A protein has these predicted regions:
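Peripheral, non-AAA+ core regions of ATP-driven protein-machinery
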Residues: 1-9, 15-313
């Protein structure tokens, strides 16, 4: 790097394979990674070149090696995704020159990574044509970007002594809390049922605003009542059974309206701020109201289907 014209952009893949002759240790060790990173950063500052360091990550997505390297650089970005899905999420864990709540969505193609201009359309592209019980569309926000994704639930009678709880793409502890609230404040007896919850598309949801959508999918599966296909759900459920307002309500409603949804089941007064959105808001104050709303439509939507019936306490 020191010979010839100074480059404008330098990519090191990966920092764990670099070594310095002045450090008596093998490549990949803590001292070598730290020393190599320091030397490269000094070169970048002296030459004015932009430096991109590619590093290994652990199984839980954390940067492998010494944390001091993370403190030395200006920004830390990581890709999320798996081999079963074509999309990748680019998140910022650190950014000295901007916000860390932004997220980029890319699709892996034969020509490399392509930007996805409409991520919500990507995650909802494979929805079934007919309305089926146990599926609810969650109006979420990833960073500062609104994102609509389908949450799927299956509630089936258990064949073993202990009911099974399985969840993919959501926090298991969050599912356990929602189930407990549905039993305590919604009158739903779930102790004799296996519960499976899945976030379609392989996306992982972290925000508590998904509570209401997950609860709606669970109630829908248990009662056999299909949820309206033109509706979205969002809201945080408290231990008292109340549904609390969440941030970026206007952003969620605007994204839902853009994709053709006409109804939103959300806490009271979801349009706290922002420009008016052409979407009908259905206030949901507590889980008991949600259970009553879905159960009331069970007779119509369950016609011709056989499914488990709720046991009300």
């Amino acid at each position: 790097l020191g010979s010839g014209d100074a480059p404008k952009f330098v990519v090191i893949d990966s920092i764990q394979t670099m070594w310095s002759d002045s450090i008596e240790s093998a490549p990949g060790t803590v001292s070598q990674v730290r020393g190599s990173a320091q030397a490269l950063i000094r070169f970048a500052k002296a030459s004015g070149a932009a430096l991109l360091l590619v590093g290994h990550v652990t199984k839980d997505g954390q940067i492998a090696g010494p944390r001091v390297v993370e403190h030395m650089v200006d920004a830390v970005f990581s890709f999320e995704g798996d081999s079963a899905h074509a999309f990748r999420l680019l998140r910022a864990a650190k950014n000295r020159f901007g916000a860390t709540d932004e997220v980029g969505v890319f699709e892996m193609t034969g020509g490399g990574l392509d930007e996805v201009p409409n991520p919500s359309g990507l995650f909802l592209a494979d929805r079934d044509g007919a309305a089926n019980p146990g599926a609810a569309v969650f109006a979420g926000v990833e960073g500062a970007r609104p994102l609509l994704v389908e949450i799927q639930a299956l509630v089936a009678p258990t064949t073993f002594g202990t009911p099974r709880r399985a969840v993919v793409g959501w926090e298991p502890s969050r599912l356990a809390m929602v189930l407990a609230v549905l039993e305590a404040h919604g009158g739903m007896k779930l102790g004799q049922y296996d519960v499976y919850l899945n976030v379609a598309g392989g996306l992982r949801i972290m925000e508590p605003a998904a509570d209401l959508a997950a609860a709606a999918a669970l109630i829908s599966s248990l009662t056999g009542a299909s949820l309206p296909r033109d509706a979205v759900y969002f809201g945080e459920i408290g231990l008292s059974g109340s549904v609390r307002a969440v941030a970026h309500a206007g952003l969620r409603l605007k994204e839902a309206a853009k994709l053709g949804f006409v109804r939103a089941f959300a806490p009271q007064s979801p349009r706290a701020s922002g420009e008016p959105v052409n979407i009908a808001a259905q206030p949901i104050d507590n889980v008991a109201a949600l259970v009553a709303l879905i159960a009331a439509s069970a007779v119509e939507t369950r016609a011709g289907r056989a499914g488990p019936r709720p046991v009300m306490g």
